[in-house]
Amino acid sequence: MIRKILAITTIFFISSCAELQQVVDSLPQQTEGILSNADIGSGLRQALDLGIEKQVSKLTQKDGFLSNELVKIVLPEELKKVDKGLRDIGLSKLADEGIKVLNRAAEDAVSTATPIFVDAVKGITFNDAKTILLGNDNAATTYLQNGKSSALYTKFNPVIKNSFAKVGADEIWTNIITKYNNIPFVKKVNPDLTDYTTNEALKGVYTMIAVEEKEIRTKVGSRTTALLQKVFAMQD
């Protein structure tokens, strides 16, 4: 009798172990997709890095700003009257050159300052990475912009000033402003174009990073690393 009880108990134990093993075997499949906030943050940073590498790099080429309507730097409102005034007195070529050199300065500055943007991405901390991951198509870029704009401006503005001198924008715009201010009866202007161009160039950088972020979010083929594939699969 005891042997029968032992045999039944053994069979029950073995059966229970088998069922338990089946449950255990199923657990990795259920939990392997769970990522920590740090993992997701790393994926978001990688997406931003790709934005700099693949999209912002396009801005550093000749006409990278000028020929891209998404980021082309146009004159601020206060200088549109300057542009019109020059064209009215037959100086359209000079007016065109003024717009072109603003974009040339931005192209040169972004080329020089790319490491600044890379460092900004490295230094970013996502307090709630999952919320950003599940946010809008440009949520990570917006987070970068909101968190780093002031610091980036401080570092980028001197680069713009150097680029202004390098591409001749200082000289051309001194000539433009002088000629405009000499037109009878016009209100004199004295714009700070390095400040304006700094802000516009930074907007262009964020715009292009956002282009790549959207690609990664919406196109599986743009997720070129295992980390990107794993992280962004969560928001599909």
Features from the language model and the residues they span:
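C-terminal motif of bacterial Sec signal peptides marking the signal peptidase cleavage site
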Residues: 13-16
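A cross-kingdom marker for long, charged
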Residues: 201-236
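N-terminal Sec/ER secretory leader and immediately downstream segment
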Residues: 23-101
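Bacterial signal peptide processing site
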Residues: 18-21
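An amphipathic alpha-helical core segment
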Residues: 159-200
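Alpha-helical transmembrane segments and their juxtamembrane interface "caps"
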Residues: 59, 91, 112, 142-143, ...
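Sec-dependent signal peptide recognition
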Residues: 2-8
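Mid-length scaffold segments of soluble, non-membrane domains
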Residues: 93-163
